[in-house]
């Protein structure tokens, strides 16, 4: 049995070898495409194709690569731009050559700038010379006209130091302004209601007469124009509360607490400003949180009766604590002795400013006492 199988196997190998070394016979046929396909599909075609391939290949590597037709194509490189730029870039010069070229260029630029500067200065000098010549020519032509300069043959220049400045042109009925001393008050809306029109203002001659002698009692002297400037129809502003005035509330002494007394300020450094919760002082017009006075006059209104500690002491020589504990205390405006800028302006007097230091210099403890003494001296001289 085994011998039979060995014979069959040897026969198959022999048949394969015969097919392998069989020569390929070329055939030409004029059959149609269907017939040719049938002939290619026959058994002998596969064997002949295999035999043809075997004969053409001498080595195994050649047989492995046998297959469909391949065409070799050349594709462009990816970094063509970089390569081109590298090729086009010139070689870097050495450091010494770069420094030499840089220094040469700097020297050339400096030389060009110097030449430009020299040319500019020359052109400037030439232009100045031409302008002066043209100006002299024009002036000579102008001087040839008779009566043009009325005897003045020089160019208008700066005034001499010793020459006096001409007097300002004044208009009748209009007050002139003088610096640094200004004696004429500005015509404000509140003052225009009292003085009336501009025609009633003092003339310049009257003001010069007043300035001849020093006004020693300017702070206490009431302006003499108050009575003479007023017409029959002019009525000074009435002292009555307006529609927006806060109602006056009289607080009894029993309602004053110890905390309010401790909250009284003795100097201006202790003040705390608060525009929402603070109360306004009639003298300094500052809205602070410290305790103010309360006027016990039923005819008082608004904030007229509110004074802070420093203002009441320096201006009138009184204390806020004593005013709060006095049931009959009236504020300075109600007594007619208020020396704030608003009340003095309403009475026709100038504002005092910070007068407390001058009052203390003359030996007075407050501004009211100093003004009172000046008023007495003025009345005695009058």
UniProtKB/Swiss-Prot annotation:
Q: How is it modified after translation?
A: Phosphorylation at Thr-170 promotes interaction with YWHAE and YWHAZ, dissociation from MYC and sequestration in the cytoplasm.
State the InterPro entries in the record: CDCA7/CDA7L, Znf-4CXXC_R1
* Region Interaction with MYC, annotated ranges: 152-177
- Give yes or no: UniProt keyword ATP-binding: no
* Pfam families referenced in this protein's UniProt entry, alphabetically: zf-4CXXC_R1 (PF10497)
Which example biological process does GO assign this protein? regulation of cell population proliferation
Residues that the record marks as modified (Phosphothreonine) are 170, 203
Sites of Phosphoserine modification:
197, 225
Q: Where is this region: Disordered?
A: 68-118, 151-217
> What subcellular locations does the record give?
Nucleus; Cytoplasm
Cross-link Glycyl lysine isopeptide (Lys-Gly) (interchain with G-Cter in SUMO2), where in sequence: 216
What is the residue range of the motif Nuclear localization signal? 167-183
User: Where in this protein does the record put region Mediates transcriptional activity?
Assistant: 258-382
| Comp. bias regions, Acidic residues | 105-117, 203-215
Choose one Gene Ontology CC annotation of this protein and give it. Answer: nucleoplasm
- Keyword line: Apoptosis, Cytoplasm, Isopeptide bond, Nucleus, Phosphoprotein, Transcription, Transcription regulation, Ubl conjugation
Q: How does it assemble?
A: Interacts with MYC (via C-terminus), YWHAE and YWHAZ.
Q: What other facts are recorded?
A: Transgenic mice overexpress Cdca7 in both T- and B-cell compartments. At 1 year of age, they exhibit elevated incidence of lymphomas, significant increased frequency of solid tumors and a 2-fold increased risk of lymphoid malignancies compared to their littermates.
* Function, in words: Participates in MYC-mediated cell transformation and apoptosis; induces anchorage-independent growth and clonogenicity in lymphoblastoid cells. Insufficient to induce tumorigenicity when overexpressed but contributes to MYC-mediated tumorigenesis. May play a role as transcriptional regulator.
Mind telling me what this protein is named? Cell division cycle-associated protein 7
- Origin organism is Mus musculus (Mouse)
What is the phylogenetic placement of the source species in the record? Eukaryota, Metazoa, Chordata, Craniata, Vertebrata
């Amino acid at each position: 049995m085994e011998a039979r199988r060995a014979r069959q196997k040897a026969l198959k190998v022999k048949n394969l070898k015969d097919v392998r070394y069989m020569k390929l016979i070329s055939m030409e046929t004029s059959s149609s495409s269907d017939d040719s396909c049938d002939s290619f599909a026959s058994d002998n075609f596969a064997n002949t194709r295999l035999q043809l391939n075997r004969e053409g290949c001498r080595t195994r590597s050649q047989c492995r690569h046998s297959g469909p037709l391949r065409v070799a194509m050349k594709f462009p490189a990816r970094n063509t731009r970089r390569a081109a730029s590298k090729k086009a870039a010139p070689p870097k010069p050495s450091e010494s050559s770069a420094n030499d070229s840089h220094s040469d260029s700097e020297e050339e630029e400096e030389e060009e700038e110097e030449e430009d500067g020299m040319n500019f200065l020359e052109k400037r000098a030439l232009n100045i010379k031409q302008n002066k010549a043209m100006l002299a020519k024009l002036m000579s032509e102008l001087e040839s006209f008779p009566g043009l300069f009325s005897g003045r043959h020089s160019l208008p220049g700066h005034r001499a130091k010793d020459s006096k400045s001409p007097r300002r042109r004044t208009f009748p009925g209009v007050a002139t302004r003088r610096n640094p001393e200004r004696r004429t008050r500005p015509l404000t809306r509140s003052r225009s209601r009292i003085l009336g029109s501009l025609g009633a203002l003092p003339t310049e001659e009257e003001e010069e007469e007043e300035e001849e002698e020093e006004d020693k009692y300017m702070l206490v002297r009431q302006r003499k124009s108050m009575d003479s400037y007023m017409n029959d129809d002019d009525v000074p502003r009435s002292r009555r509360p307006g529609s927006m005035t806060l109602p006056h509330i009289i607080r009894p002494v029993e309602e004053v607490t110890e905390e309010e007394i401790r909250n009284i300020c003795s100097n201006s450094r202790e003040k705390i400003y608060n525009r929402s919760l603070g109360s306004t002082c009639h003298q300094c017009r500052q809205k602070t949180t410290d305790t103010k006075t309360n006027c016990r006059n039923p005819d008082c209104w608004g904030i007229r009766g509110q004074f802070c500690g420093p203002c009441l002491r320096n201006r009138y020589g009184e204390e806020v604590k004593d005013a709060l504990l006095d049931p009959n205390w009236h504020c300075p405006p109600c007594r007619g002795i208020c020396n704030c800028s608003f009340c003095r302006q309403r009475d026709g007097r100038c504002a005092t400013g910070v007068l407390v230091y001058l009052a203390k210099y003359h030996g007075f403890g407050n501004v009211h006492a100093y003004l009172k003494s000046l008023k007495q001296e003025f009345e005695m001289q009058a």
